[in-house]
Amino acid sequence: MRVNIQLACTECKRRNYATDKNKKNTTGRLELKKYCPWDKKHTVHRETK
């Protein structure tokens, strides 16, 4: 079962990316290193509700 999620920057707290994940394979919160246009650098983005 795939669900849509939002990824928020850990530094500026803005929700920059939307993606989906498989809840059966990834039960915890997803963390990806993505580019933040407001910080102008790559930061860790975490899954939000």
Swiss-Prot record:
PROSITE patterns: RIBOSOMAL_L33. InterPro entries: Ribosomal_bL33 (IPR001705), Ribosomal_bL33_CS (IPR018264), Ribosomal_bL33_sf (IPR038584), Ribosomal_zn-bd (IPR011332). The keyword S-adenosyl-L-methionine does not apply. Pfam families: Ribosomal_L33. It comes from the Bacteria. One of its GO terms (molecular function) is structural constituent of ribosome. Keywords: Ribonucleoprotein, Ribosomal protein. Gene3D superfamilies: Ribosomal protein L33. GO terms for cellular component: cytoplasm; ribonucleoprotein complex; ribosome. One of its GO terms (biological process) is translation. PANTHER family: 50S RIBOSOMAL PROTEIN L33, CHLOROPLASTIC, LARGE RIBOSOMAL SUBUNIT PROTEIN BL33C. Belongs to the bacterial ribosomal protein bL33 family. This is Large ribosomal subunit protein bL33. It comes from Nitratidesulfovibrio vulgaris (strain ATCC 29579 / DSM 644 / CCUG 34227 / NCIMB 8303 / VKM B-1760 / Hildenborough) (Desulfovibrio vulgaris). The gene is rpmG.
